[in-house]
Amino acid sequence: MENLDQIVSEAQVAFAAISDPDALEQVKARFLGKSGQITELLKGLGKLPPEEKKTAGAAINVAKTAVETALNERREAIRKAALDARLAEEALDVTLPGRAEARGGLHPVTRTLERIESLFASIGFEVADGPEIEEDFYNFTAMNTPEDHPARSMHDTFYLQNSDGTLADKVLLRTHTSPIQARYMQAHVKRYGQLGKMPEIRIIAPGRVYRVDSDATHSPMFHQVEGLWVGEGVSFADLKGVIANFLKSFFETDDLTVRFRPSFFPFTEPSAEIDVAFMSGALKGRWLEIAGCGMVHPNVLRIAGIDPEKYTGFAFGFGQDRLTMLRYGINDLRLFFEGDLRFLRQFN
């Protein structure tokens, strides 16, 4: 029988010289394969006398265990060396701060709307909503705008087309949020008209509106917030008080002057343009047109089913985008809608 200690020693030396896992398996076959040295010794046990077989078998198994131990240790050493090499190649500085999860933020126009809604809610106004694709009746007729009014022309209003390219029957993209007021007044009359006395209507109507216009201060799609207060004894003095208090709260300053200039709108009478002048800052001393307003025209109330002899009201309309530009000192309206994150992140 071959010297078992020599076989174990040869195996240990052979395994230690290998650094490749495939080569290690090939060397393993020399000792533990089907024709390996240890395997051949085990096969030869049958030729030994019974009195020697037991002793020889035990010695061979001890040698086999020693070879397997050396093999497994070398396998683990090769695996660890490969892992260490990979970690060194892909080394990370674990002391570096991790990447923070990106967080979104509200668009500045949305922030402005939330502020407007909050300020008007504090004095009892509700927020009303309505469709952006509107009927000609609610957009124009209900607002006392006659058939021959220039605002009805395709130069100012987006009319919708049917699938065959023909013009849809009096369906358009709303040019203001006044249709929300008309629909709300009709629903209010339907709900309370039989009671003899209706509760006051106090709403703001924010939303997207559409007009054929596009330059640095105008967009074919923009945001508008209109307001309506209808009740008994509502006056122009109430309108002036609401507007002045809102503007001072919105801009967070008493250092501004509000001016009402006579104007014309078909849905209000009398009508006025609202200007503001700041007494300090970059806009100091400049009058800036900021909104339109007026007492609700009696015809608008009649069309909604409200008696203009008993009830009066006022309405106003702010450009939400215009307020946002003034609030943040932005000169070009288009910047808000170009989707440039470098610009928008400044407001978060």
Curated annotation (Swiss-Prot):
UniProt catalytic activity: tRNA(Phe) + L-phenylalanine + ATP = L-phenylalanyl-tRNA(Phe) + AMP + diphosphate + H(+)
Cofactor(s) in the UniProt record: Mg(2+)
Enzyme nomenclature, EC number: 6.1.1.20
Pfam families: Phe_tRNA-synt_N (PF02912), tRNA-synt_2d (PF01409)
CDD domains attached to this UniProt entry: PheRS_alpha_core
Principal place of residence: cytoplasm
Protein keywords: Aminoacyl-tRNA synthetase, ATP-binding, Cytoplasm, Ligase, Magnesium, Metal-binding, Nucleotide-binding, Protein biosynthesis
NCBIfam families: pheS
Protein known as: Phenylalanine--tRNA ligase alpha subunit
Native species: Dechloromonas aromatica (strain RCB)
